[in-house]
């Protein structure tokens, strides 16, 4: 009697395409990028950070968790080599468009941005934005009304 929960979870994951592992590229090795790379939030949902990239020469070659920060010049090769399908932007607003352009050039079709900058991409590239300030304002609005 009841539902086979394991089977149900498996079916839902299949529909949402969260079964298996999806490789992502993280652009930005500053405070936010380090926090993302050190967190299990993506891994818990089937995403593996397969590469971390930063244009700051002082950060290239440093380690975040088990990942070595790479120069963005290696992005295209890494995306193709590791079958990366998602790019995560953890960069300042001024760096968001150039970083998105590099991801698009590499063949990434999904970009998740923590930047407040509006990003222009071709129609076949999906951009999702997550702004902590906007989320806080949204929560505050509904709490106060």
What are these regions (language model features)?
Residues 91, 114-116:
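Short secondary-structure boundary segments
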Residues 119:
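Short, glycine/polar-rich helix-capping loops at beta-to-alpha or helix-loop-helix junctions
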Residues 1-106, 122-144:
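Hydrophobic, well-ordered beta-alpha structural blocks that scaffold small-molecule cofactor pockets
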